[in-house]
Amino acid sequence: MDVDLPPPGPLTSGGLRVTALGGINEIGRNMTVFEHLGRLLIIDCGVLFPGHDEPGVDLILPDMRHVEDRLDDIEALVLTHGHEDHIGAIPFLLKLRPDIPVVGSKFTLALVAEKCREYRITPVFVEVREGQSTRHGVFECEYFAVNHSTPDALAIAVYTGAGTILHTGDIKFDQLPPDGRPTDLPGMSRLGDTGVDLLLCDSTNAEIPGVGPSESEVGPTLHRLIRGADGRVIVACFASNVDRVQQIIDAAVALGRRVSFVGRSMVRNMRVARQLGFLRVADSDLIDIAAAETMAPDQVVLITTGTQGEPMSALSRMSRGEHRSITLTAGDLIVLSSSLIPGNEEAVFGVIDALSKIGARVVTNAQARVHVSGHAYAGELLFLYNGVRPRNVMPVHGTWRMLRANAKLAASTGVPQESILLAENGVSVDLVAGKASISGAVPVGKMFVDGLIAGDVGDITLGERLILSSGFVAVTVVVRRGTGQPLAAPHLHSRGFSEDPKALEPAVRKVEAELESLVAANVTDPIRIAQGVRRTVGKWVGETYRRQPMIVPTVIEV
């Protein structure tokens, strides 16, 4: 957290506090906590994928310290849609408290169920759809249809005694959506008639003028490209973009080709989409990868993952000649039906070069309309602001330039400048008597998942440069296997944090007390012990030094 704000004080009686633990000044890790009358409601719980300067990291989670001490206060986790940056961290939250009600649409919950199955977690689901309302303690939620690049997306109105909040989630105003489900702007405008006290609004494309193209415009382009291909066609797209996959299938079948899904997430998501009726394709039009390799090249279309150059994705392995089932040849047509996420340029261009070296023809959005964004452009957001007429605005889901562009749009529609809150992750915004203001900040950092340690959640060393710039505290504890009983004094070591060798002595006593409380609570899982140690040291450092160095806990069982 770059801001230097004190912790927020006690919430004014009857007020509402909004704290984003992720999703601001970044695209990913979306998680927002609402507090009212001592109870909590969470909207979304997603991951961020690591950049090139974060080696050895598979996933980056929201920092959940803010809720770890208040798990029993959580009324529900409510989901806007099923993209990884909104649902990917759910298993890690449910590890802390498995019975948190998880509220979402049919398709979103189906994806969450698949994800949680990998972690042997069975969530408590509450399925909703647009037009419905649910009550969760002191919070009432109403759901609005939203058009986005994955099915069944929702915007969420949260009604509290402090006022009405509208969270758009990821939103677009496609007037010709392939699934026939446009964003419910009339419903949100009716909400504006009764008064929206705070709008949390998607900022992703706020700096792009005008209105974004419709998803329906991609289909004809894909049809033209497949029709003109003499050999095999491989289309890469996001595994959650069911409307895109449907258009690829429709074009392939119309041109006499059969379709095969490639990549674990693509196969899984399309299976779920078919089961729930979101994807329509006959069994006779689908083939497995092995059968696809035996067919004439001009009789097949492969739909695969790997649009962002992920090293282990299906397309990347094809480009390196390492895919166990598919061997690319000169004359294959590769269509990258996606946007280029900032930070992935080097990886994507590397895959394109490798494909070109093989002799394949590569088509991206730069050559033909093979992709459109799932986020509203500036002109669409103006429709939203003029319809909802919010009293206060908190731009979310975007980098600083996107957030500021969104703030400018809000101001242009008459929202007072002092009512537009440009917050950061960890910054608390209080809504009291219809007025929103920043009240302080809670410590937040990045929580890393290292795939080499299955299910491990914690801060890990990313490299000497990052350690020296941020500082870190390494904590080693030795406990008896099966009981969690400490067998030696905790050892703490810091670097880039404090030069005083005695600076961490109070933290040692804090860790000893935490270990004793964990033993008393019969906590024996080393992951839970590590989480408790990290939380304790992080809280002590934050309170004592107002710093957030990396906390690296190691639990040794003997």
Swiss-Prot record:
There is a cross-link at K502 (Isoglutamyl lysine isopeptide (Lys-Gln) (interchain with Q-Cter in protein Pup)). Both beta-lactamase and RNase activities are inhibited by chaperone DnaJ2. It catalyses: a beta-lactam + H2O = a substituted beta-amino acid. The keyword Hydrolase applies. Residues 1-269 are annotated as: Not absolutely required for RNase activity. Its cofactor is Zn(2+). CDD domains: RNaseJ_MBL-fold. It holds the Pfam family RMMBL. Zn(2+) 2 binds at D85, H86, D170, H397. It comes from the Bacteria. Substrate binds at H371, V372, S373, G374, H375. Its EC number is 3.1.-.-, 3.5.2.6. It is found in: Cytoplasm. Disulfide bonds: none annotated. Its main location: cytoplasm. Residues 451-558 are annotated as: Required for beta-lactamase activity. GO terms for cellular component: cytoplasm. GO terms for biological process: rRNA processing. Homodimer, may be a subunit of the RNA degradosome. Interacts with chaperone DnaJ2. PANTHER family: RIBONUCLEASE J. NCBIfam families: MG423. An RNase that has 5'-3' exonuclease and possible endonuclease activity. Involved in maturation of rRNA and in some organisms also mRNA maturation and/or decay. Has both beta-lactamase and RNase activity, but the physiological relevance of the beta-lactamase activity, i.e. whether it confers antibiotic resistance, has not been shown. This is Ribonuclease J. It comes from Mycobacterium tuberculosis (strain ATCC 25618 / H37Rv).
